[in-house]
Amino acid sequence: MIYETDEKAVPLQEEINYLKDYVALEQLRMNDPNSVQFSYPENTSELIAPLILLPIVENCFKHCDKQSPDIEISIELRDTKLQLIASNAIVKTDNSDQNSGGLGLENLEKRLSLLYPERHKLTVQVTDESYRTTLMIDLRV
């Protein structure tokens, strides 16, 4: 996938394959690899901006409760509308900056605004126990 990042769009299936490899790699580092659930469509033909989904998936592993991550990642595609929902367990502390969203999501929002103006929605929900990011993109050309 790295060699394709100069492209404006790559097949969604290749992006999903890249995410599958990333998730598998992260699972190798975990005490309980079964604490990760990842669902996705098979054999899609849509195109998507390269590596646009990766920051959300990375955040699941970066900010999860290391003792009990409970990571769930779901990608759904209906016609040209893609929905990614990623959630993970967190350990909430008084000085936690998890409500801020972070630089990664801020940069992702800017990139989405350039690539999918008026065709995307990125939301973050934080509770005492979990962090959930939802991304919706209309992939129509």
Residue ranges with predicted function:
Residues 140-141:
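C-terminal end segment of the histidine kinase catalytic
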Residues 1-125, 130-134:
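Two-component histidine phosphotransfer core
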